[in-house]
Amino acid sequence: LHLSIRRQRQMCIRDRIEVITMPGKGEFKLTGNMGDVMKESASIAVSYIKSVTEKGRYKVDTEYFQKHAFHLHIPEGATPKDGPSAGVTMATAMLSAVTGIPVRADVAMTGELTLRGRVLPIGGLKEKLLASKTAGITNVFVPEDNQADVEELDAEITDGMNIIYVNNVKEVFAQALMH
């Protein structure tokens, strides 16, 4: 999954995940034919972003979440989508939308997210890396617990790729957001 800024306060992940904020009262809307596990991942990402911004690490007004509504959409709504592996990407897109800090256009990321920000391993890594490489994205954040999976892949898949292993989503924020 690839992250690139489309407009201020609106993020798009290679036309796969979009997050916008707008005036509101804290509402959170999900669209794009997501399954239950993916919806749970989005909910975890929202809770995590609220917790890290309320602690003052990022410059977000403490009342921001009460004064804004959020909409997360995954295009191609006719296509069912599910699984936890977009959690890190959703959290990164949400933090970018909330702070206005753009995400580097040359990165992709994958990983299940916990409420405490841990990045858990995912399946389908080969396909995700191939998709990134095909899209011309060679910097990919991958759960550290997937390192053995990467090492088992054919060199033709990983050659020319900068695979960045992470344990916590804060590592992704530090390297993927354009501070």
Language-model-derived ranges and their functions:
Residues 1-9, 13:
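Single conserved hydrophobic/aromatic residue that forms the stacking wall/gate
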Residues 14-179:
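Peripheral, non-AAA+ core regions of ATP-driven protein-machinery
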